């Protein structure tokens, strides 16, 4: 009899080990089961720990609504997420990195929570697991509180200049990119492109120009090879399950080896780029010089610099081109709007003063800026923001939220479904941003974040989009391939990216 018991125990142990091993693979039953256990097991501890802090009448509601695998849908930007979920009010929750997170859906809630966003704590590695932490865990976008303030003060200057500072080199790179992309185009040619694919590396090269200046062919090739390495290892981030725990890295020697190779080549590249920039006449214009000197002076660590550069060059570019991919679709479906925008651009060009065009691009009160904002409103790059917590207890939407409670923002509920956008809230109408003051939608329009802590590169990202849209509309007539930009079935994630992009092609007829 004891033999049968021993055999049963052995079989159970083998089954458990196999289940745990398969839990490291995304989109498997084992992964979902382990993620669920972690989620359910963590929730009571979190709320029990804060029980004494709860308001006696309006505690954070532990809603019975828990949407299975919603966190995975958020990360992968799946288009099958029911739109109705964004219309539900109240505090529903989403499994996120082992916790059930309250979701913010209204402008008043956003204002109450994000008024001190500079003091918020981001979720560890953005709930992306140990691979995410190994790549960018000490980057300026992932750290919090005093750590963030110290690093931000050092690395932000190159990315927080006036938009007008960026226009000349952004415009130069965009013209160069189109000429390299279509070298045979000599005018009068009709092009058919997929913006998310054909223009994917454009923001990458713009930021490269800002950081390193004009790279040699050898350095350019090395950077492209490093990009391939980085793309490969990033596939292992945001997999959920046991990958959320650092100890799980011992099961992945191949991934650790890939990360080691990437980090070595990435550090060597930046060291060489720094040395090359020092020998240039315009060395001070290359951001890598001031940033690398900050490391030499002990203001930031080498890891903090490498992770921040990784974040700027590899992560944010995906968001930028993901945002742009929808704009040509919307403009192609509205010939009258496109014509009006072209006239505005032509009028700005007619002023021959050197600073006139730069000021036009830098302005936020133009139809050009409104077209970009309206596209970002209807097509936020993520369904939910990264989790973060407040430093103090706070009344939010009728609930007493204890300090340290991680929350996310439902970007669709805020950008699209808020009644303040009017009866045409689901329609693409850029003029709405010209009819209201910026203050009126400060807390109901998510794009670069809220409060004191927002994306440090927003001025550069906005400049890239404005110059790119202006260049496209000024030189081409945009026409649709027949699929509507509102068709969610054509929204897919780009490769291993975590955001939605427009998959439709667009027709460009040279003017």
Swiss-Prot record:
Q: Which Gene3D superfamilies match?
A: Cytochrome P450
Q: Does the keyword Iron apply?
A: yes
EC number per UniProt = 1.-.-.-
Which GO terms of type biological process are on file? mycotoxin biosynthetic process
Q: Which residues are glycosylated?
A: 364, 373, 383
Q: Which family does it belong to?
A: Belongs to the cytochrome P450 family.
The entry's protein name is Cytochrome P450 monooxygenase roqR
């Amino acid at each position: 009899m004891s033999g049968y018991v021993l055999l049963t125990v052995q079989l159970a142990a083998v089954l458990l080990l196999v289940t745990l091993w398969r839990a490291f693979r995304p989109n498997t039953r084992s992964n979902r089961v382990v993620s669920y256990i972690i989620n359910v097991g963590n929730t009571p501890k979190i709320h029990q720990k804060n029980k004494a802090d709860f308001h006696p009448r309006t505690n954070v509601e532990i809603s019975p609504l828990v949407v299975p695998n919603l966190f995975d849908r958020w990360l992968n930007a799946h288009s099958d997420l029911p739109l109705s979920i964004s219309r539900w009010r109240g505090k529903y929750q989403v499994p996120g990195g082992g916790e059930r997170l309250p979701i913010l859906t209204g402008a008043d809630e956003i204002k109450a929570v994000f008024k001190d966003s500079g003091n918020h704590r981001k979720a560890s590695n953005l709930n992306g697991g140990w691979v995410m932490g190994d790549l960018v865990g000490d980057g300026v976008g992932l750290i919090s509180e005093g750590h963030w303030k110290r690093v931000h003060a050092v690395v932000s200057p190159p990315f927080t200049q006036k938009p007008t500072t960026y226009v000349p080199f952004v415009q130069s790179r965009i013209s160069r990119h189109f000429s390299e992309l279509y070298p045979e185009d000599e005018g009068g040619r009709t092009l058919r492109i997929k913006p998310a694919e054909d223009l994917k590396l454009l923001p990458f090269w713009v930021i490269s120009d800002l950081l390193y200046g004009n790279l040699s062919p050898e350095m350019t090739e090395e950077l492209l090879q490093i990009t391939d390495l980085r793309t490969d290892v990033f596939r292992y981030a945001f997999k959920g399950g046991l990958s959320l725990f650092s100890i799980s890295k011992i099961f992945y020697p191949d991934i650790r080896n890939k990360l080691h190779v990437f980090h070595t080549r990435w550090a060597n590249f930046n060291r060489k780029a720094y040395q090359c920039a020092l020998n240039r006449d315009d060395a001070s214009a290359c951001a890598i010089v001031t940033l690398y000197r900050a490391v030499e002076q002990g203001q930031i660590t080498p890891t903090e610099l490498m992770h921040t550069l990784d974040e700027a060059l590899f992560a944010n570019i995906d968001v930028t081109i993901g945002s742009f991919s929808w704009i040509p679709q919307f403009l192609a479906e509205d010939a009258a709007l496109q014509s009006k925008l072209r006239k505005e651009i032509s009028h700005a060009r007619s002023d021959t003063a050197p600073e006139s065009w730069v000021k036009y691009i830098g302005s936020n009160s133009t139809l050009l800026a409104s077209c970009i904002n309206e596209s970002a409103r209807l097509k936020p790059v993520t369904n939910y923001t990264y989790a973060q917590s407040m430093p103090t207890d706070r009344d939010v939407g009728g609930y007493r939220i204890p300090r340290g409670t991680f929350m996310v923002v439902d970007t669709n509920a805020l950008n699209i479904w808020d009644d303040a956008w009017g009866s045409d809230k689901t329609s693409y109408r850029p003029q709405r941003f010209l009819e209201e003051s910026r203050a009126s939608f400060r807390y109901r329009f998510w794009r670069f974040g809220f409060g004191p802590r927002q994306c440090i590169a927003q001025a550069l990202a906005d400049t890239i989009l404005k110059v790119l849209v202006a260049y496209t509309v000024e030189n081409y007539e945009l026409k649709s391939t027949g699929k509507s930009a509102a068709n969610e079935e054509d929204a897919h994630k780009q490769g291993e990216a975590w955001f939605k992009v427009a998959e439709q092609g667009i027709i460009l007829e040279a003017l």
